[in-house]
Amino acid sequence: MLDPINWEAATDEAVNNLIRLIRVESVNPPGNEEPAVLLVKEILEREGFPGEAITIVEAAPKRANLVARLRGDGSQRPLMLSGHVDVVPVEREHWSRDPFGGEVHNGCVWGRGALDMKGFLAMYLQIFLLAYRRQQPLKRDLILAAIADEEAGFEHGSRFLVDEHRDLINAEYALNEGGAMTIHAAGKRLYPIQVAEKGVCLLRMSASGEPGIGSVPNTDNAVLQLSNALHRLGRARHLSIHSTPKLRKMLESLSSQLGFPLGILLNMMISPAIAGLM
């Protein structure tokens, strides 16, 4: 039987790793994510994680990506924990604290990337370290990915890995950023869940009409029919909203914690009649 996890010690370790990550200035543009990726590698190797299970690939000089793999028994496909190490630029004059200082103040870690998304990466790294230390039997491989170039187009990061090194990151499930930003409301700390981002809906449209020639146009030709349809689609502002079971469960849970009036408003969002008006 596995020993209980000392969550206080694990939290302290994750915070310390986050501070170290923030102090690496991996601003994108220009990128230069290599030092942050090498820091993750150093933390893993210091723990004794085998070097042959860590892969670093560069899409361009200094644009590095790290993928580490903890083996399971292979009965299920892998789970990937993925976080980007690059951050957006800073305007230091607008900061009350050093954006790359990683200071702890009022119970929070301050710095560029604390939320987006070195904080996530530090948590994923901690989970990965705990699973390795405990030698916990896994049904699937656990993949840790520290990725470049999320902030400026993905070309040197996730897109590069998908196009050139898909074997390293091929997984059944992936946890990334989004959703788990802390919400402080009604004196409570709440953690929402985000299942996915907006996607793409590909449509194929066809039309039929009366043929004709340019010198004698008619209002029933196929091109005009398609043009009218595209115009109506472009003007649509209130397309149908489809809430997933996971979203409804999250909103119900949040509403029960928030009480009146915020909880009532969240419950209204679940109502199909109200959601269609929002």
Stretch-by-stretch model annotation:
Residues L2-R112, R133-R140:
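Acidic/His- and Gly-rich active-site-bordering loop/insert found
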Residues I19, L38-K41, A122-L129, R159-V162, ...:
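Predominant activation on well-ordered alpha-helical scaffold segments within soluble catalytic domains
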Residues N28, L115, G209-S215:
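A generic structural motif
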Residues I56-A59, E150, I193-K198:
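Short Gly/Pro-enriched turn/cap motifs at secondary-structure boundaries
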Residues G83-V85, E177-G179, A207:
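Fold-independent oxyanion-binding glycine-rich loops
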Residues C108-V109, L115-P192:
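Acidic/histidine-rich catalytic neighborhood of metal-dependent amide-processing enzymes
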Residues R166-Y173, G179-K188, I193-L202, G214-M278:
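Acidic-enriched catalytic cores of C-N bond-cleaving enzymes acting on peptides and small amides
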